[in-house]
């Protein structure tokens, strides 16, 4: 249960990037919201598959955690938080798993390499997308929507098989914070304040 919907979604995102041409050695893959549930699994999966992973976080104290999952570069959230001023920036990222949306996603689109793809999995930073179509028209960037609810059965089987094969168990264990039902009110407050990292595994029998 520690993998959960977040881990399943992360695997779907990685598969979508692969289906749209992501291969090892073409440059770093960006993961926004990297210390969260989806982001943590995405970092671990991409690193295990041999990709150079750049992890975006607004919490400096999570750097050691993210590097332990396999991130090779830590990108401060502030570096990508400003709204788009130029529709295109230097081509930097070979792929991206984005859990943030909003202004950060708009900024990332302008930094993608030619023909690269962004898998959008969340909207922690907002549902609006203050971007231009220039990255799509001049660099052939792909924006891929990831839905974990209505996936066909065969794709679900494929994703879970990939999780079993590609997600290192030691990395999964490093993401888990055990909790009980009595801990839930405090955990709720921590979630709203952005203080939770990785996955919380609630023992309903404790």
Residue map of PLM features:
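A glycine-rich, Thr/Ser-enriched phosphate-binding loop motif common to dinucleotide/cofactor-binding enzymes
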Residues: 1-18, 35
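Glycine-rich NAD(P) Rossmann-fold beta1-alpha1 loop
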Residues: 7, 33-40, 101-102
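Short helix-loop-beta connector
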Residues: 17-28
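Residues at the starts of beta-strands that form the adenosine-phosphate
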Residues: 28, 51-53, 117, 142
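Conserved hydrophobic beta-strands of the Rossmann-like cofactor-binding core
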Residues: 28-31, 96-97
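Adenosine-nucleotide cofactor-binding segment
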Residues: 47-103
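Glycine-rich phosphate-binding loop and adjacent beta-alpha segment
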Residues: 103-169, 204-206
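C-terminal hydrophobic helical "lid"/dimerization subdomain
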Residues: 157-206
């Amino acid at each position: 249960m520690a993998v959960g919907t977040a881990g399943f979604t992360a695997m779907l995102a990685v598969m979508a990037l692969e289906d749209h041409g992501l291969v090892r050695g073409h440059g770093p893959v960006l993961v926004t919201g990297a210390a969260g549930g989806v982001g943590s699994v995405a970092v671990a999966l991409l690193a295990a598959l041999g990709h150079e992973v750049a992890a975006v976080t607004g919490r400096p104290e999570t750097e050691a955690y993210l590097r332990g999952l396999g991130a090779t570069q830590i990108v401060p959230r502030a570096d990508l938080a400003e709204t788009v001023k130029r529709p295109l920036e230097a081509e930097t990222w070979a792929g991206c798993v984005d859990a943030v949306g909003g202004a950060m996603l708009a900024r990332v689109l302008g930094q993608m390499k030619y023909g690269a793809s962004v898998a959008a999995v969340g909207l922690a930073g907002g549902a609006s997308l203050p971007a231009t179509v220039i990255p799509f028209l001049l660099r052939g960037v792909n924006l891929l929507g990831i839905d974990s609810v209505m996936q066909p059965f065969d794709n679900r089987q494929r994703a879970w098989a990939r999780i079993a094969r590609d997600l290192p168990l030691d990395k999964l264990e490093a993401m888990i914070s055990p909790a009980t039902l009595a801990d839930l009110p405090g955990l709720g407050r921590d979630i709203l304040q952005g203080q939770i990292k990785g996955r919380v595994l609630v023992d309903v029998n404790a």
